């Protein structure tokens, strides 16, 4: 079998054009990935600083991780109200702050590891209390913060 030569491909006398190149999906997503990475670095650094400032004793209730997650959830509640009801944010603000900064700051993976460490250290009741308290407090924080932010907005608009 022979390889066709460009001058012999297609019908004689008809110009053959190469298909137009499509922009890759990466081209449009690169700025989003970049701001998420930048925000994640900032949020993760803030969480690490909190862990250094308020270390958890071995076998003790992981208060730092608990409060980091609760505060992060409260901030996301306010943030979502602000960018949906108040301020038409740039398309990169939500991925930077919501996914990046707050995603890096809150740490549900450390939450899971803390639960396992408590169980392994012989503190299953503390682990169960931590599991339930974090879940309930985080959900309540989002709800209460979003509700409070909306109420503030209603009062300001009067």
From Swiss-Prot:
Fluoride-specific ion channel. Important for reducing fluoride concentration in the cell, thus reducing its toxicity. Keywords: Cell membrane, Ion channel, Ion transport, Membrane, Metal-binding, Sodium, Transmembrane, Transmembrane helix, Transport. This is Fluoride-specific ion channel FluC 2. GO terms for biological process: cellular detoxification of fluoride. Na(+) binds at residues 103, 106. Na(+) is not transported, but it plays an essential structural role and its presence is essential for fluoride channel function. It comes from Streptomyces avermitilis (strain ATCC 31267 / DSM 46492 / JCM 5070 / NBRC 14893 / NCIMB 12804 / NRRL 8165 / MA-4680). GO terms for cellular component: plasma membrane. The chain crosses the membrane at residues 25-45, 63-83, 95-115, 126-146. Belongs to the fluoride channel Fluc/FEX (TC 1.A.43) family. It is found in: Cell membrane. It holds the Pfam family CRCB. It catalyses: fluoride(in) = fluoride(out).
